[in-house]
Structure formats: C-alpha cells, structure tokens
Amino acid sequence: MGNYQDECHLKEIHQLAEEFERCRKLLLALGDENRQHLILEMMRMGQCEGVRVGAITEKTNLSRPAVSHHIRILKEAGLLKVRKEGTKNYYYFDADTEAMDRLLQMLAHAKEIMEHRPERK
C-alpha cells in the first residue's frame, strides 16, 4: 500500500510542478525586490488614470531605463497595461485575473500536498 501512496504523491508533485511552471512569469515579476518597490510606489501614487515612467523614477532610486525594464516585465506578466495619449505613456494596474487564479490554485494545491504528505520514517 505504501507504494501506491508514494505513486499518488509523486503524481501530485509532478502536477504541482506543471502548475508552478505555468505561474513562473508572474512569480518572476513579483519576486524581484525592485519591482516590488515599483509596485508599492505606484500604489502609493494612487493615480487610477496611470503613471508615467518619469514620475515613477522620481519616487524610486531607479534610473529611467531600469524603471522601463521593470515595467516591461510587469506588463509581460499581465500586471500592468499602458494607456497612450499622443506620445505619452501612462502605466496602470490591470492584472490578468486568469494568471492570478492559476497562481492561487497552484498555492492551494501546494498547501494541500503539504498537509497530506506521507509521513517520513
């Protein structure tokens, strides 16, 4: 019976690994300290219509190219969108809820596996 439990547990672990892989872009975007700081500063600025790179640069200790780099990663992860007004770009939060749902499901699955993992001897 122990073999069957181990096989079931391994299947769960492999499924979790696949779920984790699907969440990597979002995890990488959120996992960087500079991007976390950038997100917090944008939230503190609280401008629903969007924020320009220059305004973010003023609030952080990051250069303009660094802010642009981090914004690109956050956009690719589905956390930010851009609104264009002529030549001006305004960045705002508009998260990809499907990506967030996948992340929440992956975390719930990981918790479930940890709560029901086989006992070690």
Please state what every model-predicted region is:
Residues 57-58, 69, 75-76:
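Alpha-helical residues within the helix-turn-helix
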Residues 75-86, 92:
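Beta-hairpin "wing" of winged helix-turn-helix
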Residues 66:
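Conserved H-loop
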Residues 1-23, 40-44, 92-121:
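Amphipathic alpha-helical dimerization/coiled-coil segments
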Residues 60, 71, 107, 111:
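Short amphipathic alpha-helical/adjacent loop interface patches that line ligand
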